[in-house]
């Protein structure tokens, strides 16, 4: 994990600054116990090699454990371990420095930066880091005061570093809770970090994960979790995740979205929205596949209540297409009068004055054949709606078709007329008022 501290501290040469500080103190007051102590310390001022610093500090500590400059020595240990890349020792040294000055900027920043790199960070380490983040967030101005920051940091540099430090401490507070598996608290802290700085791909991912981890008890959080995953996967600006991580996360998002929603419908819109905004809009939701199915069933039930003929047909078709459909037809439907059904005209035979109609109830190609007791008048264009009742005579499963014998007098919706009827209708005079 890359931890960007940039302008949090201007401390790359803090060892030199501390040396100058000690030298200044040496001129002002006799803090050295004797010249031998100063001679023991002096090699630190003559090199930039942290290995020499460490060897010198160890000798100094061994020979003068109660030095009046022990607090300065602890700060030098901190910088030395940091320069050597010894994260655990730097972390512990920072804790020692904070005992001297709880607002020491360099020590606090070392702790919140190093906690990510400890392998692993134990409960005590997390407690220490939590106290550091609390101090930073509660007293940012205080820890950037001249007496607490590196001597070479200017007021302008301090002012520029404060917002970045606030964001860093805030996301670290969330990471600590996330590492403890206190996902509800982590969610709150990560959301605060996003509000402070929306351009944080890693934090967006952590926030999504913290919300998803609560899925068993709070399944309603899953859609928003998917949003933050989409944000982390699609955002490619400053502080975004590496391209390889975004690619892997995109693959995960595609799978998770499909599993949750039941299809990829709306996924591209989700990604586009997340790319442009770090947080979801008010009222944001993604319907789950279960919710969609529930709504479909409810809508179907409501439709069946208002369209009983469609409900009847659905039940009949389900019974006929079942493995025992043939038996069902022979014992329950054949030669029985089936109540009124409704379908759209597909074909008539013959086209004019037909005695046979093909209707579509569900299948647009037709799933009902009506054999009439006589010819209907004229002809009718396909697509018109016809209601009928009739006696079931036969059926086939593939293609599905049920054949009824129907009394044409009980047919509703046929609009065809014979030629003589049309002529009589057209010959009628219209009397206009005088």
Which residues does each predicted region cover?
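N-terminal leader/linker segments that initiate helical-solenoid repeat arrays
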Residues: 22-76
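Structural register within alpha-helical repeat arrays
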Residues: 40-43, 76-77, 111, 166, ...
